[in-house]
């Protein structure tokens, strides 16, 4: 089975202890691509990232999960979106997003969609 996911994988910061945060990568579409790969599907991901250290780290993360990244575009002047998860005393989560400079927000503006979908 061959499946392609399109979306945004972001930098995730979650509070581990008081003022200590764990950094990972997540996003609904990226998580789906990873889980499908783990189940044995030929999974690929389409998004746009920057050329910075964390963008490269995210690409490595997806490759380690055996998600194909050949249709991930790199922006010269944009980077990854970021979100923070905060738990209140009852354990309920709140999310805070920083996406104004996200490369994925402009993915379809900078890509020939017809050519891309023909490649898939």
Residues of each region from the PLM?
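Glycine-rich phosphate/adenosyl-contacting loop at the front of the ribokinase-like
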Residues: 1-68, 107-109
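Conserved N-terminal subdomain of the carbohydrate kinase-like
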Residues: 46-120
């Amino acid at each position: 089975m061959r499946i392609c996911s399109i979306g945004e994988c972001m930098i995730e910061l979650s509070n581990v202890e008081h003022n200590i945060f764990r950094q990972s990568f997540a996003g609904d579409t990226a998580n789906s691509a990873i889980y499908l790969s783990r189940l044995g599907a030929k999974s690929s991901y389409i998004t746009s990232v920057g050329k910075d250290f964390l963008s490269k780290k995210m690409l490595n993360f997806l490759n380690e999960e055996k998600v194909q990244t050949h249709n991930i575009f790199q922006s010269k002047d944009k980077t990854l979106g970021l979100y923070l998860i905060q738990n209140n005393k009852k354990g309920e989560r709140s999310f805070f997003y920083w996406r104004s400079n996200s490369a994925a927000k402009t993915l379809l503006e900078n890509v020939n969609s017809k050519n891309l979908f023909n490649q898939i």
